[in-house]
Amino acid sequence: MQVWKGNRVNAAFYELPRKFGPTLSLAVLRVNASGSLQTLTQMTFRALHSCSFVSIRGCMNAQFPDEETKSGEFKRQEDAFREWISNDASTRYAAEAGRYHLYVSLACPWASRTVIVRKLKGIEDAIGLTVVDPVRDELGWAFRDTSGDIPTGAPFESTDPINGFQFLSEAYRATDPNYDERVTVPVLWDAKTKRIVNNCEDDICRMFNDAFNDFAQNKTVDLFPKDIQAEHAKISDFIYENVNNGVYRAGFATRQRPYERACRRVFEALDELEQRLSKSRYLFTNRIVEADWRLFCTLVRFDAVYHGHFKCNLRRIIDYPNLQGYLMDLYQQPGIAETVNVDHIKRHYYMTHTAINPTRIVPIGPLLDLTKPHGRERLN
């Protein structure tokens, strides 16, 4: 038996007799905030020849990490890799077409924002893209070949064409063999040095906007305009703290009072944004900036998953006339619908978060039509 102890999850591996073939019995354990030991799962499975103990071990913190305070509040971990790509030789990573690859989940609002910026700048030929399977189990984000076409929307999961990884944790271990935190998306991978450059969506979006402009089909698109830099940073922080991460603080809270505080703050923020968007087509008059897409990535998931799954159910986005019209307006921008897959989004949340949804039943609704006329042109 081999036992690996991580910061939040322990795992015990029992090697079975050879007559059973290359199989392993795996027990995944977690120490709760109260100090008690919880068995997350126990299973026996046939080991793949290409799957080493290290690559499995690297997945142990993938699902339901103990990112919570003693009071039951969700506290998100910091991004581990923050290297920078430049086009002026100021960093060790140079902007080059075909060198970097983006690993994402289409369910993740953080990762989806990088996909949107990649699309808006027109750098698809310069930056490759691979989508992980939407269901993140105890082994973490996985690369699996799809057995059929997804009904509508964006590309679905695929195998890894760059490294042949089975799990995204292998990219983390290749970069840092001692990494034992939660494996997250997005990941910007350097095929030349074979390591992760950055796993912070804010950094990746800015690099796509600036450093890769020489390779962009849409060079005039600037999502971080300098003339509103300070105000843009302020509204971005507001959206992140109260909306983007706010729904997670509500959904991942493990006690009533932290949940209620987080949930109420989400709707206080939405009320403020509803008022702001009653006077302006976008957050900054008539131009779309990165903060708009930051907000969009939560709004487009809200009625489908955050309202029910995360219990942010005081109101729906469709109950906010300006936010709903704004959401439809952004969704109808060229190329954006291709980056959104509601089926993928719902399957991830409802099938992955088994502590919240033990049955793993995926709801068939709601019926969402973001293609209707939105009427936001009146605010031009």
Model feature map: region roles:
Residues 4-16, 35-380:
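C-terminal alpha-helical interaction module
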